[in-house]
Amino acid sequence: VKDKLLRIAEEVYSAYRELPKDYDGHVKVGMGASGSPTSKIDRFAEEAVLELLDNENIKLSVLSEEAGFVDRGYKDVLVLDPIDGTLNCVRGIPFFSVSMAIGQKSMLDCEHALVRNLANGDIYYARRGGGAEMNGHRIAVSKYTRDESIFSLFMGPDAHPDTNKVRMHTSRVRSLGCASLEMCLVARGDAQAQYMNCTNFNRMIRVVDIAASSLILREAGGEVVDLETKGKLDLEFTLQDRKNFLAYGDIRLKELILSDSA
């Protein structure tokens, strides 16, 4: 399974790097199945994956941000975000990825996950019960100390006011625009928390965004919790399910941050 995910990620990575410098990837070419506008670069990457699955007879159905659910007749589902961080991609900010997980019904039953940074080629992979790795080396979360920690926060006009309370628990904040890679930073111990508390339902997180990175973080020793239920975050394999969440490496952050969240 890992080899299949690596093959798919390599297809997207190679196809992206072969694009001409004047490629107009920002152009909107329609509406995706999720209800969000589809950029030309999103559709390009998704079509590269779907074509590969067909050409190499890879036995997976697909749930993708743009195409929605593609029933190819298989129980195992590839949960795909062909370009996570589209705006970063089209603006030349080197922090965007292809994100893939394999499961059957929801995020919590995913067995394999792979996130590849399409700007520098870094590969994050996890198998349920098998730990997490970056570029073939095991990774693990790190301990929280206020003065040394970095929190990745969802910011802007749709950010819940509680975000400002959470910000006070760290001396450094980032908002990087690619949920999958931000969570991988927590998994590898270079950030200590990721917090998304959004007042606009249409901008909350979906399963295609973080199915892969959630398994990677959990296998690295961290956790992702639902801000509403305070329990483990789970998302059904549908584009209609959206949630706010906290991802952390150190268990002490769960109580510390959730106490600030309405």
Where are the regions that the model predicts?
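Short Gly/Pro-enriched turn/cap motifs at secondary-structure boundaries
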Residues: 29-30, 37-38, 91, 174-175, ...
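General beta-strand structural signal in soluble alpha/beta enzymes
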Residues: 61-65, 89, 174-177, 226
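Residue-level signal for inorganic ion chemistry
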Residues: 42, 53, 86, 117, ...
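N-terminal subdomain of lithium-sensitive/metallo-dependent phosphomonoesterases centered on the IMPase/IPPase/PAP
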Residues: 1-83
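An extended, acidic
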Residues: 9, 128-129, 140-262
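Buried hydrophobic packing segments
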Residues: 49, 53, 98, 102, ...
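DPxDG-like acidic metal-binding loop motif
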Residues: 74-129
